Amino acid sequence: MGDFNPRLLKTIMIPRHTYTPPFSFQASLVKKTKANFEMVIARYDEDISWSDNYKEFRTVYNKGGSVDYEAIPLENVGHLADTMLRHIIDRYDTLADVTFFTHGSFNYRKDQIIKEEGPCDRLWSDFIKTDLDTLVYIPRSDLPAVSERAYDYSETFGEVYQRFFSRPYARDFEWACGKIMSVSRGHIHSRSKAFYQAMLDWILSPYEGGAPSQHVYRTRGIYIERFILHAFNG
């Protein structure tokens, strides 16, 4: 069985703490509230001042040290994947019309460049939507083969897909690069709360008889990254 090839990411890493100036406030949110649009930020130790123009819309899940703004503390596991799933599970019945899931910093990977203008993988304004059918992401279609594994993980992509979707894995859908996406409540509700709970339980489950390492958490996050958009598409 093949192992996951990091070259599939087509990624050139640059410093994670690259500073991003505050994004401009988008007119589409004038007279809107957090019930219409919620920005969910998974922070570790990043400077999230890029979101300062959206303070009234943001919810910060903080896995790092203390901060001087409102934030919900979380254990540092699962990267963005567990944060997304926890938010969906906890707010399933009270989700905003559109939820924008993102990391605590931007543009530290060359395949996930988001800007207000100019060459990039996606424009910032694309994500700031309140339409009830919103589904915005950086599209990729280079899914791993059914027998591939992410790094040295014990399950293949085919096995993990079967675990969640209860059918054979077919490489016929897109995935959302970086798990950065704006998703309508309707798209999220295309799956049951129990479906997302099963994903989170898998991320947090013991590995080889013990607590998962950060490497295992991040590796499981790669599987979720490949499949979460597919879940939102029903």
Regions found by a protein language model. Name each.
Residues 2-234:
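ER/Golgi luminal nucleotide-sugar-dependent glycosyltransferases, focusing on the catalytic module
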